[in-house]
Amino acid sequence: MKVLSQFVNINNSKQNILTMITSNENPVLLIVHGGPGSPDRPLVFKYNSELSKKYTVVCWDQRGSGLSYSKDDKKKELTIELMLSDLKELVVFLLKKYNKDKLYIAGHSWGAYLGLRFVSEYPQYVKYYVGTGQGISSYVDEIYKFNFVLERAKELKDIKALEKLKSFGAPIGASYSENSEYEAGYVGKLIHKYGGYIHPKSTLSMNSYFLDYIRFYKLDIFKVLAGMNYSVKNLNPQINSSDRITDITELKVPILLISGEWDYICPVPAAKVWFEKLSAPKKEFAVIKNAAHMVNFEKPDEWNKELLKIL
């Protein structure tokens, strides 16, 4: 396996891609990371490099993220539309570079939102779409999140959390603006605490996660951290004010969704409701047990197996 790192000029922005390749004959798999602003190449390299036997695996540090982060980025407004445009330019570049008509896209979390929107708009470039931790609607997801932490707090007899949750109650209405008392940040902390981000039985942990990043990026870790802050600050308000993918009811390419059974960052029940109504040439929803939002790194053997099955 060859590992290549290079900068590509995308929409007048130098963006870095890491490629794991064994043969130019293999189909291209573009990994679209989550966050926003959280490049995943250290974990993909560690846990998913097996895929390079059958795919040319490309990890993209998105605009404002990882090695692609630059202070010059602040001169241009960071929008979801710009990120989609970047993704299109990168896809066209990769297809030309590897002489392919189409490629595979695997998006995780925020990357699954970006990836699915891209596939919906530009199906002519995509052979197969894989969404891991597929968020549906920021607001609808929040209802499932609240119910999850409330039930877990009861199971674990977490009295302090129960009192806090009951003090502001479940989200109601149709948007965050109608719920000024609701504390999404607190609910998010409980999801982490209760195993909805990384499952308690997983060999992956937050400590090992961060150590992998430091070992991989070395001194560039400071650039990575700056990019995370920049991307979250600029993109999260746009993401949270949208319905994400609820308007997508039909795809022209096959789709595979993969979720950890315990994922409540992007709740599995919400994804299933949307998925059942989706029309696509072929569709499959794989749920992996004893895993949560980071299922692609918590249960890499099972996740990799799903990716290899669609070839």
Stretches found by the model and what they are:
Residues 82-102, 117:
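Conserved acidic catalytic loop of the alpha/beta-hydrolase fold
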Residues 100-143:
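Conserved hydrolase catalytic core segment
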Residues 36-48:
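The serine-hydrolase catalytic nucleophile loop
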Residues 126-172:
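A catalytic-pocket lid/entrance helix-loop region that shapes and gates access to the active site
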Residues 51-70:
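Conserved alpha/beta-hydrolase
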Residues 159-246, 253:
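Alpha/beta-hydrolase
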Residues 291-300, 304:
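Catalytic histidine-centered segment of alpha/beta-hydrolase-like enzymes
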Residues 251, 257-259, 263:
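Short beta-strand/loop motif that positions the catalytic acidic residue
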